[in-house]
């Protein structure tokens, strides 16, 4: 399975970079995983609704440009479906079973994802009803993907 994590914004925090590097290393035994970091759109602090839409649309174009037609796209969004770790593992296993060898997880910028990205997505996933920093989501997502592979192989890790 080829997994892409497409994310808006540059990761700055050293501790997050270290955690992400660790999970990428662990995941290399199970799948080819790449993190694609795309620049966020520079915008002033107080945006109108119209300006917010423009920012999301510009970021959305960058995201969609990185997704091929044969990729199964999972948008990370607060309004997405929440799953347990076991349910998430089953979902990933089903994708592999049904021949979906390319999977892209999409993490938007601080304003979220554009409507075009949401339309392109095959499903939407939420890790919590809480708002979480999009940079932290990369680490949380990688840990859950790793956990899913361990669950699916019956390997110790998940409790």
Swiss-Prot record:
SUPFAM superfamilies membership: alpha/beta knot (SSF75217)
Signal peptide: none
Domain of life assignment: Bacteria
UniProt-listed CDD domains: RlmH-like
Entry's localization field: Cytoplasm
Molecular-function annotations in GO: rRNA (pseudouridine-N3-)-methyltransferase activity
GO CC entries: cytoplasm
Pfam families membership: SPOUT_MTase
EC number in record: 2.1.1.177
Its job: Specifically methylates the pseudouridine at position 1915 (m3Psi1915) in 23S rRNA.
Similarity comment: Belongs to the RNA methyltransferase RlmH family.
Subunit organization: Homodimer.
Protein name: Ribosomal RNA large subunit methyltransferase H
Naturally occurring in which organism (per UniProt): Bacillus cereus (strain ATCC 14579 / DSM 31 / CCUG 7414 / JCM 2152 / NBRC 15305 / NCIMB 9373 / NCTC 2599 / NRRL B-3711)
């Amino acid at each position: 399975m080829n997994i892409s994590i497409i994310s808006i914004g540059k990761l700055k925090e050293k501790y997050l970079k270290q955690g992400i590097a660790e999970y990428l290393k662990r995941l290399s035994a199970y799948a080819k995983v790449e993190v694609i970091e795309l620049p966020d759109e520079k915008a002033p602090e107080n945006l109108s609704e119209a300006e917010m839409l423009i920012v999301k649309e510009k970021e959305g174009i960058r995201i969609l440009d990185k997704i091929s037609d044969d990729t199964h796209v999972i948008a990370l969004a607060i309004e997405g479906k929440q799953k347990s770790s076991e349910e998430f593992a089953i979902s990933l296993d089903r994708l592999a079973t049904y021949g979906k060898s390319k999977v892209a997880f999409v993490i938007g910028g601080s304003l979220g994802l554009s409507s075009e990205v949401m339309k392109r997505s095959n499903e939407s996933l939420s890790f919590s009803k809480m708002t979480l920093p999009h940079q932290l989501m990369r680490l949380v997502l990688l840990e859950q993907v790793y956990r899913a592979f361990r669950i699916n192989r019956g390997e110790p890790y998940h409790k």
